[in-house]
UniProtKB/Swiss-Prot annotation:
Keywords: Carbohydrate metabolism, Lyase, Magnesium. Optimum pH is 7.5. This is 3'-dehydrocarminate deglycosidase beta subunit. It holds the Pfam family CGDB. Optimum temperature is around 40 degrees Celsius. It is an enzyme of class 4 (lyase). Its EC number is 4.1.99.28.
Length: 132
């Protein structure tokens, strides 16, 4: 629905501990974190292990598997989430970042099951140094 707006342009940051970038919810209403079915990331053509990535929303940060259990934590449409890639140290310059986000829309049944949608966005961004 909003695939070209999933990755926030110019949000790629990095330091010696890893990298991060921001994403937006590809839907028009807030959804619980438990509706995330998949979040996959590739940087410069190399897939990052989804079991290692972390997602930060509101004032919390979780591994993807933990976030998928968070029924009471809501991702609001106007709030960016930060995707952290621990250990992925990037050199200065431009990098190709791709994210695929699959969400389950619990209140829209299709053939007796909640609607499931997957959107992919790709951006070329210059890495910025992560500041405290």
């Amino acid at each position: 629905m909003f695939r070209e707006r999933i990755i926030v342009q110019d949000s790629l940051v990095a330091d010696e501990s890893g990298s991060a970038f921001r994403i937006r919810l590809p839907w028009y209403r807030a959804l619980p974190l438990s509706t995330i079915e998949e979040l996959s990331v590739t940087v410069d053509g190399t897939a990052f292990d989804p079991a290692r990535l972390r997602i930060a929303v509101n004032d919390g940060e979780w591994a993807l598997a933990e976030a998928q259990l968070r029924t009471d934590d809501v991702w609001f449409v106007l709030d960016d989430a930060t995707v952290r890639l621990p250990g992925l140290v990037l050199d200065a310059g431009a990098h190709e970042v791709q994210a695929t986000l699959s969400m389950r829309i619990p209140y829209l049944p299709v053939a007796g099951k909640p609607l499931s949608m997957a959107e992919t966005d790709q951006k070329r961004m210059d890495v910025k140094e992560l500041t405290a």
